[in-house]
Every structure is written in C-alpha cells, then in structure tokens.
C-alpha cells in the first residue's frame, strides 16, 4: 500500500488544501492528513477544532472515503511521522512560485534525513491557488 503524508497547520483547511488531497488520492492508496502545532504561529483554531473542521470538510461535506484518508495531529518532524506510518511520500501543495523556495529547501532537508522518502509537489486548480488560510481567517 502506497501511503502519503500531507502535513500542514490547516488553520483552517481551504479549498486549495482539499484540491491537493483529492489529487494526491490519484497517486497513493491512502493519504494521512497531518495537522501540526508550531509554537512560532498564532492559531485561530485549536488543534482539536482543526481536526473536526477537516473531518467535516472531507468526510461529511465531500463524502470522501474514510478508508483512504486518515486525519491526525502531530508534534514531531514529518520524517518521523512518515516512518511511524510507513509512508514513502510527503505531499506538499504549491500555490505560486513564491511557495517553491521554502518547499524546495524543506524537501532537501527531508531527503537528507531519509533518502527513501520522496516529496511530491502538487498544484491546486487555478481558482484555488490564491486562497490561503490567512485570508480565510480574515
């Protein structure tokens, strides 16, 4: 079974995130949507609220397959999460070229930490690319 981890804060989840999740289901058998807590960020929603919003968005509203999508929280390195769940793919969404520099560096660091885990970049559809969680909160 090919397992992918889609890490993020998802504060809140956006249509762009959902688009990336749907596209990733074409590449892997199971996607683990992993919402994290970063002490350097100010959050609008608690971790439990974010998980509930993600579940409602994916399972109830969109009726996506619960067997193919697992929603968890985590507070460790993404690489450690991949090893725990035997995931070989880290899924990252890109909205614009401005996202690429940071994501490229992150993918390089993850590759150094574990050569067997690949990072896959997915673009959301154009109508969802300009929406960030920051703007949804505002």
Residue ranges and their predicted role:
Residues 1-138:
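Nucleotidyltransferase catalytic core that binds NTPs
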């Amino acid at each position: 079974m090919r397992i992918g981890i889609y890490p993020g804060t998802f504060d809140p989840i956006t249509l762009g995130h959902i688009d990336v999740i749907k596209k990733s289901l074409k590449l892997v058998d199971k996607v683990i949507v992993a919402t994290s807590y970063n002490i350097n960020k100010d959050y609008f929603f608690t971790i439990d609220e974010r998980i509930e919003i993600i579940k409602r968005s994916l399972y109830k509203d969109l009726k996506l397959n619960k067997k193919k999508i697992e929603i968890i929280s985590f507070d460790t390195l993404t690489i450690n999460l991949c090893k725990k769940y035997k995931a070989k793919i880290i899924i990252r969404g890109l909205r614009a070229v401005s996202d690429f520099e940071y994501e490229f560096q992150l993918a390089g660091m993850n590759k150094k930490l574990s050569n067997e885990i690949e990072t896959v970049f997915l673009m959301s559809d154009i109508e969802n690319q300009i929406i960030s969680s920051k703007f949804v909160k505002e």
